[in-house]
Amino acid sequence: MVNKVVAENRKARFNYEIIDTYEAGIVLMGTEVKSLREGKANIAESYASDEGGEIWLINSYLPEYLQANRFNHEPRRRRKLLLSGREIHRLRSAINREGMTLIPLKIYFNDRGRAKMELALAKGKKLHDKRESEKERDWNRQKSRLLKAHG
């Protein structure tokens, strides 16, 4: 069960406090799947939003597939995310009531070859929270160096 990660949002865990994660399918066109397989997608500035009872991925970048001609896709188009009705209801209530956001963490191909997205329900970190997590990361790094040196 090897998942091939093709795009990752590395700053998400630094900028947001991750509350819960979900696996969502993505509605893609054929050229978008081929472009994803090349591994040049970018989801760093993207987010997901609830519109009309559906969850949509906004501002993600999948470059045009160069071998396709006139049937190519729009690189920054909105893409529908596939979740169960119960998950959509839970996400909608959390977004509307508690002021949380939906952040994509990574896009990958599962063992059946389907494009999936790991979506996080998150709350934005304040500046002092970011500093605190940076201090903690530095301390863990120093600790591992000391243990390795005196090991």
Swiss-Prot record:
**Region entry Disordered: which residue ranges?**
124-151
Question: Which BP terms does GO give this entry?
Answer: trans-translation
Instruction: Return the Basic residues bias intervals.
Output: 142-151
Q: InterPro entries, alphabetically?
A: SmpB, SsrA-bd_prot, SsrA-bd_prot_CS
Q: Write down the superkingdom of origin.
A: Bacteria
Keyword tags: Cytoplasm, RNA-binding
**Basic and acidic residues composition bias: which ranges?**
129-141
Q: Does the keyword RNA-binding apply?
A: yes
Major subcellular location class = cytoplasm
The record, for Gene3D superfamilies, names:
2.40.280.10
| Record CDD domains | SmpB (cd09294)
Q: What does this protein do?
A: Required for rescue of stalled ribosomes mediated by trans-translation. Binds to transfer-messenger RNA (tmRNA), required for stable association of tmRNA with ribosomes. tmRNA and SmpB together mimic tRNA shape, replacing the anticodon stem-loop with SmpB. tmRNA is encoded by the ssrA gene; the 2 termini fold to resemble tRNA(Ala) and it encodes a 'tag peptide', a short internal open reading frame. During trans-translation Ala-aminoacylated tmRNA acts like a tRNA, entering the A-site of stalled ribosomes, displacing the stalled mRNA.
What is the official name of this protein in its record? SsrA-binding protein
Biological classification of the source = Bacteria, Pseudomonadati, Pseudomonadota, Alphaproteobacteria, Hyphomicrobiales
Gene transcribed to yield this protein: smpB
